[in-house]
């Protein structure tokens, strides 16, 4: 029997997030970004014969190998991601993303950069050349949670037939336009709903969902302040 599991949660932008676990990022064998919790991660739930088990397009053996490599050499967990953004015209900007540092080396797996277009809709004086920045935040949040669910479901031998997210965020432009010091410029709240179809027991899906929330890098970024250093120079 397939179960449709649907839930949602508000992103608490000012509250305390998960701090009693240890979040780390990927290893050389995976070259992808994921999280490990010291109270029980992928290594604790591995099932298979060690011959390259794949579930949801995820090589579970490589996943477990990444975790074990990080346990043996914690420096492999240190990643640094980069982006370069240039103004095009009006509210239109173009971001290039390619290289990054991770697993102790500069990654060169991407032959060409990803190009992300950013703009505003006409009502905000843009030309719809791309989603605006705050919409991209919603996309990043859902993308990160997708990785967390799919990877951890594979490690727990939970089969996922379908997975989707719906997101909404509320902004009051009084903050962005400098019309009120009492209104924050960013999202006042975010609502996210997750719908997942799986034949796993509901309690297993709820346990997976709670774990992914605790270990999601982007959800942590949204819920908790991140130190940001800003510099500007004359070009």
Question: Where are the regions that the model predicts?
Answer:
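Short hydrophobic targeting helices and cationic amphipathic motifs
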Residues: 10-13
């Amino acid at each position: 029997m397939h179960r449709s599991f649907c839930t949602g949660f508000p992103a608490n932008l000012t509250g305390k997030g998960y701090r009693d676990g240890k979040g780390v990022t990927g290893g050389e064998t995976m070259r992808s970004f994921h999280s490990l919790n010291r109270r029980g991660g992928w290594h604790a739930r591995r099932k298979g014969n060690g011959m390259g088990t794949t579930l949801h397009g995820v090589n579970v053996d490589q996943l477990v190998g990444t975790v074990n490599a990080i346990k043996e050499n914690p420096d492999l967990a240190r990643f640094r991601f980069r982006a370069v953004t240039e103004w095009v015209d009006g509210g239109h900007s173009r971001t290039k993303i390619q290289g990054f540092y991770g697993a102790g080396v500069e990654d060169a797996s991407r032959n060409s950069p990803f190009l992300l277009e950013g703009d505003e809709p006409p009502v905000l004086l843009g030309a719809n050349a791309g989603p605006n920045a705050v919409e991209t935040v919603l996309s990043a949040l859902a993308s990160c949670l997708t990785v967390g669910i799919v990877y951890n479901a594979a490690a727990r031998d939970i089969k996922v037939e379908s997975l989707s997210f719906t997101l909404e965020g509320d902004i009051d432009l009084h903050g962005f336009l400098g019309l009120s010091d009492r209104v924050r410029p960013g999202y006042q709240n975010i609502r996210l709903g997750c719908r997942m179809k799986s034949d796993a027991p509901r309690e297993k899906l709820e346990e997976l969902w709670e774990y992914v929330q605790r270990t999601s890098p982007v959800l942590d970024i949204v819920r908790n302040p991140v130190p940001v250093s800003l510099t500007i120079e004359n070009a």
